[in-house]
């Protein structure tokens, strides 16, 4: 029953044409890579949303008017007056423990793998975050043009022995240009 629910949720979250061959064929909350953020929110709203910068890009956090996810992190180039979306991360808070996040991730991973045989999959394993005992476990799927899908669970523990049962599931779509910028930032 849980598997059916996850598949239904994934299908509601994502629009996938039967011949999807690049990241622009996907939607999260009706938004795709290559769309203008201005099609969904006003410039005044963008200015009100929390944001930060990553290299040549700005990221804006949207937490209002969402149907499925708790928040969206939308990435676009700093000096782009059209606000063309290069990255899109959907976040779901998980309050029932990291193992439930891993179950959700596993189900979605199987669904992505069954939809696409031509993507290059990589499980990065459990990686450490900046805070002690906090980790994340990303799995990436790369298209031939280097666009990327990433799913990940973030375990936001308080200490080695104390979990706060507040974890995060992330589903990301990234253009190849944004993936390259992330790689450059990681080297620096």
Task: Please name every model-derived segment.
Residues 4-18:
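Sec-dependent N-terminal signal peptides
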Residues 21-65, 87-188:
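Non-cytosolic coordination micro-motifs
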Residues 60-84:
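Compositionally biased P/S/T/G-rich terminal and signal peptide-adjacent segments
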């Amino acid at each position: 029953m849980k598997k059916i629910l996850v598949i239904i949720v994934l299908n509601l979250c994502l629009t996938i044409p039967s011949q999807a061959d690049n990241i622009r064929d996907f939607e999260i909350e009706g938004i795709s890579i290559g769309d203008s953020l201005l099609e969904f929110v006003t410039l005044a709203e963008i200015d009100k949303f929390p944001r930060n910068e990553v290299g040549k890009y700005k990221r804006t956090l949207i937490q209002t008017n969402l149907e499925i996810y708790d928040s969206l992190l939308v990435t676009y180039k700093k000096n782009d007056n059209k606000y063309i979306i290069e990255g899109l991360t959907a976040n779901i808070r998980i309050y029932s423990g990291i193992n439930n996040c891993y179950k959700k991730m596993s189900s979605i991973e199987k669904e992505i793998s069954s939809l696409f045989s031509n993507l290059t999959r990589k499980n990065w394993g459990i990686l450490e975050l900046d805070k002690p005992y906090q980790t994340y476990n990303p799995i990436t799927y790369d298209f031939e043009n280097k666009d990327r899908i990433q799913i990940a669970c973030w375990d936001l523990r308080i200490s080695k022995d104390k979990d706060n049962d507040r974890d995060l599931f992330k589903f990301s779509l990234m253009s190849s240009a944004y993936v390259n910028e992330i790689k450059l930032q990681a080297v620096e």
